[in-house]
């Protein structure tokens, strides 16, 4: 197996990744990533380091989007039953995730080795799963790929949800209020996804939770067939059989989870009140921390200071992942980013007005709501502008040279458009921070 290129950071700790993480044994390997056990030199704690080949990702836009989505989602989640993402780092060729190390491994392996679990243990894991899933839903995150392979067990026997690469955010919901992307593993796919008419992420996750619970107690999948189309037919019709050892209460509960009609399928709130679920005592879950979520940041300076590293990483000049996220690289090497308190809409209007005044050819990028490509007469220079919301208070403006003459680019960007945008930002804003 080829060695992973180790990139040391500043300092004398050249035998450690970025001078921070000492890599140990290989935990897993895939087509685009390897996961190593590692030790954090600063704390002595074990971590898992996922290493991805950026070049390979750039040849697979869908996977690159999954990685971007995973960073975006995991940095906003903090829950005892969700794997914690500590840090994201990068070199020119690789991306590194430093994550919580979950010693017990996959729940899937536990079932494969030891067979089905008792109802009591299954209930405990399921309660923790619902705690994590409900927490995600309360924050507009839908996992869409819940299965035992993505559920880990720590040394204390607690469940941890991982792998948010296929997750959806509320801003991916179309005007009809539904998601439309075909995601998930075949045996866990909800029937409404197969209809391709759109679906609600929360209800799809509940279905997958039902499949997981069935597998925990039965030791096998409710819908299984060597022929995938036959399996889909069974899912669509809800054709499955309970094992004889399932209790009547559990059969009733699973039937509500695996209701093929999403409109009548049990909800998270209803799950929390179900007799089978609460048996043995269960602490009521509070999915929203009102004290934290009601706090308001008083100024943009405070907001800049408190920004999570995962918010800034794709804009940082030292660890620039924006080439990966945009699916292309910046061959000219000229780019600049700054923060603004103005709305993306207002800044976009300024950019469009500037293009008209300067007689520049401009087109909007399909993949970005506020992304523009501008080109001077005869192709003398090209500028790419991306305006994206960073959080509730701040917006990032990014400019990149897209070929052409460097002096013309500097004249247009540094001498004109940048000045105009910053002037607009300064009209009512006290803060304008460069990144």
UniProtKB/Swiss-Prot annotation:
Show where the Protein kinase domain sits: 21-277
The record places the active site at: 145 (proton acceptor)
Task: Give the matching PROSITE patterns.
Answer: NAF, PROTEIN_KINASE_ATP, PROTEIN_KINASE_DOM, PROTEIN_KINASE_ST
Location of the NAF domain: 302-326
- Show the GO MF annotations: ATP binding; protein kinase activity; protein serine kinase activity; protein serine/threonine kinase activity
Quote the record's binding site residues for ATP: 27-35, 50
Q: So what EC number does this one have?
A: 2.7.11.1
Domain description from the entry? Answer: The activation loop within the kinase domain is the target of phosphorylation/activation by upstream protein kinases. The PPI motif mediates the interaction with the ABI (abscisic acid-insensitive) phosphatases.
Q: How does it assemble?
A: Interacts with CBL1, CBL2, CBL3, CBL4/SOS3, and CBL5.
Under catalytic activity, the entry for this protein gives:
L-seryl-[protein] + ATP = O-phospho-L-seryl-[protein] + ADP + H(+); L-threonyl-[protein] + ATP = O-phospho-L-threonyl-[protein] + ADP + H(+)
The family database entries (CDD domains) matched by this protein are listed as: CIPK_C (cd12195)
- Top-level taxon: Eukaryota
Q: In which tissues is it expressed?
A: Expressed in roots and stems, but barely detectable in flowers and siliques.
Could you list this entry's UniProt keywords, alphabetically sorted: ATP-binding, Kinase, Magnesium, Manganese, Nucleotide-binding, Phosphoprotein, Serine/threonine-protein kinase, Transferase
Listed SUPFAM superfamilies:
Protein kinase-like (PK-like) (SSF56112)
The knockout outcome noted for this protein's gene is: Increased proton extrusion and resistance to high external pH.
**Any one Gene Ontology BP term:** response to pH
Question: Which parts of the sequence carry Phosphoserine?
Answer: 167
Q: What is the lineage of its organism?
A: Eukaryota, Viridiplantae, Streptophyta, Embryophyta, Tracheophyta
Please list where the region (PPI) is annotated. Answer: 333-362
Q: Which residues carry this modification: Phosphothreonine?
A: 181
User: What role does it play?
Assistant: CIPK serine-threonine protein kinases interact with CBL proteins. Binding of a CBL protein to the regulatory NAF domain of CIPK protein lead to the activation of the kinase in a calcium-dependent manner. Acts as a negative regulator of the plasma membrane proton pump AHA2 by preventing its interaction with 14-3-3 protein.
Indicate the family of this protein.
Belongs to the protein kinase superfamily. CAMK Ser/Thr protein kinase family. SNF1 subfamily.
Give the matching PANTHER family.
CALCIUM/CALMODULIN-DEPENDENT PROTEIN KINASE KINASE-RELATED, CBL-INTERACTING SERINE_THREONINE-PROTEIN KINASE 11
Q: What is this protein called?
A: CBL-interacting serine/threonine-protein kinase 11
Its induction note reads: Up-regulated by salt, drought, abscisic acid and glucose, but not by cold.
Post-translationally, this protein is described as follows, namely: Autophosphorylated.
